[in-house]
Amino acid sequence: AETPLKAEISETPGFRSIVAGAETVAAPGRDYTAKAILRGLEPGRAYYYRFIAPDGSISPIGQTRTLPEGGIDKYRMAVFSCSNMPFGWFNAYAHAAQVGDFDIALHLGDYIYEYQRGDYPSAKDTVAGRLIEPANEIVSLADYRLRYASYRADPDLQAIHARAPMLCMWDDHEFANDAYADGAQNHQANEGDWQTRKAAAEKAYREWM
């Protein structure tokens, strides 16, 4: 079932004054993800945000920052790429979230990887406790959705998203290794139609990112 949510924006973490708000819905057609567009915010300002469910439950508080306007003296970005979870812990996310001396996080792609467990990295190179879901190579919409959910369960990835806005672009592994218009190195004929797989990957990306 759909769940209506209320998004609130404040200049303080205590939310004593709400400066903007919006209504949104977490729906099964979007894998129960939700996004809200907030208007009327000041440029170059830090804000706090939260979501409130119909029963009064409140989400963890996140921080964001609007883009500046006009000339600026300094703008700092925390840059990430190629985050293959089974290879190790997301210490870079954790460090950036803890230090927090940047305006925006920028992810240059390969936010997730499509491989099955034990493929890349190999089973012997997989760090203990870093098991991805699903275990198989992701091909279907349900597969891609679960892989994003698996990554987002990581507390360090949650921390960086809660600490600052993240601007993301996809590379190839959000679809399959060495993807191109009509196929990919890591897409075989027995995995179905490439265009169907590509559309599923893009839908999951736009839901979760």
Kindly give the residue locations of the regions a language model identified.
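Metal-dependent phosphoester/phosphodiester hydrolase catalytic core
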Residues: 1-209
